[in-house]
Amino acid sequence: MRVVFMGTPDFAVPSLKALVEAGHDVLAVVTQPDRPRGRGRKETPPPVKQAAHALNIPVFQPLKIKDADFTALLKKLSPQVIAVVAYGRIIPPDILTIPKYGCINVHASLLPKYRGAAPIHWAVINGEKETGITTMFMDEGLDTGDMILQEAVAITEEDTAGTVHDALAVLGARLLVQTLELVGQGMAPRVPQQGIPSYAPPLKTEDELIRWDRTARDIFNQIRGMNPWPGARTYFSGKVLKIWRAAVVEEEGAALKPGQVMSAGRNAIVVGTGRGRIAVTELQLQGARRLSAGDFLRGTPMPEGIVLGEACS
């Protein structure tokens, strides 16, 4: 099948490679422009662009997707289908109608749950026990199109947004290939989304901040959902302290002061919350690297009784 692929981050790379391995004729890759990244703010190509170059596939990076010249280019390519995997922009109506079989999207949730830009993060943050992949025919709405295939994966307490991301990237690639096979055979179902939708908006800076008056379970899920990016943060000695890993050690009981360090031992720093306690096992002080709790405490004492989050200046 003649395919134009639209995608940007690491999540989309397995899908692009799977299309090529399945024998599809990937005419072009459309991805977002190079962006400054890292401490040096060096212009860096998106992961999908790097993968496309390795596969010798032409790459286009329009500054604006609502552009007459870009739309004309897509029409000239004459794809049978456009596959969209985490491209990062809403596809306008005049592009949706170009391919014979339409635009097919791979979305990282069990629609209609978690429509939007950050479904993986929010599924973990909200303590979901499962999530998954949905492929769908795209329409003008935000992840509202008719579904084709859907498959669930479990989320365990050991999972982070990172591990769920990696599992869904692989699953999404497999379901995309299966979906295009069904589409090409004229056998793809069109299943309208039913039930009450929920939404996964882009993460904001305030979403990273740990509110210690919440429950230990909620904070634990927040930490997992912010790992490996952007990191759940609090404050210690006037500096940002990111907490990367923790465990719930007590579900009940409130601290005298939420955020108070109850103990700081060899393997964990136990912190009181609005209900229950968590044991912090991996953390990172502003300007330093990620460390286990034991290694952190060897270089940075954390007295019992100190309250995290108080020194926000």
Curated annotation (Swiss-Prot):
Source organism (scientific name): Pelotomaculum thermopropionicum (strain DSM 13744 / JCM 10971 / SI)
Sites binding (6S)-5,6,7,8-tetrahydrofolate sit at: S109, L110, L111, P112
Name of the encoding gene: fmt
Question: One Pfam family name from the record?
Answer: Formyl_trans_N
Q: What is this protein called?
A: Methionyl-tRNA formyltransferase
Q: Which PROSITE patterns does the entry mention? A: GART (PS00373)
Q: Record's family?
A: Belongs to the Fmt family.
Recorded hits in InterPro entries, A to Z, give: Fmt, Formyl_trans_C, Formyl_transf_N, Formyl_transf_N_sf, Formyl_transferase-like_C_sf, GART_AS, Met-tRNA-FMT_C, Met-tRNA-FMT_N
Tell whether Transferase is among the UniProt keywords. yes
**What GO molecular function terms would the record report?**
methionyl-tRNA formyltransferase activity
